[in-house]
Amino acid sequence: MPREIPNDLGQLTFALYLDMMGNMTLPSAAARLQPTVPRAVLDTNVLVAAARSSLGASFALLHALRNRRFIALVSVPLMLEYEAVLSRPEQLAAGSRNAESAVKFLDVFCLLATPVHLHYLWRPQTRDPADEMVLETALNGGAQTLVTLNERDFAIAAANFKLKLQKPGEFLRSLG
């Protein structure tokens, strides 16, 4: 039975939670690592954009993740970065959320994402030291794509490691 498409972050978080509770089984490791499904890391600015507006490509990527159209890779340092940024008072106010809803959203995001253990630290590679954890998650997780709204800071490192940089809209279009 098709569900109504959620139109804000709170509704999407709840829909993701219902999906997870309804299925009660997570896909096997083999199923999660299918070579036909692109592996990507979402930069923090993509999640911030999704939290601020349900109208853009960043928010649409969350639906694509929910529908398993790509594998989102996340490491512990990157998850902590997501939480720190999404819980900032100015981010909560901009997205009309509270800290509890941000944490619930990230809890569900963790259920859908594939964890990456950072075996190698490649620092320094990016123009902004705060972006290193994003790049390291992509490299250690075998991502094909790093999805960001800030391609400039990653451009040289991405070229060195043959990592595709795409904005949310470009990545969404590449999913078909």
Predicted segments, located by residue:
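PIN-domain endoribonuclease scaffold, especially VapC-family toxins
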Residues: 64-121
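Alpha-helix capping/helix-boundary segments
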Residues: 46-47, 78, 152-154
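Basic nucleic-acid-binding interfaces
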Residues: 2, 33-36, 110-114, 118-120, ...
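Short, well-structured N-terminal submotif of metal-dependent ribonuclease cores
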Residues: 1-74
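Acidic, PIN/NYN-like endoribonuclease modules and their adjacent C-terminal/linker elements
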Residues: 2-20, 27, 132, 139-145, ...
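Short, flexible helix/strand-to-coil boundary loops that buttress conserved ligand/catalytic motifs
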Residues: 51-52, 86, 158
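Active-site neighborhoods of divalent-metal-dependent phosphate/nucleic-acid chemistry enzymes
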Residues: 110-146, 151-153
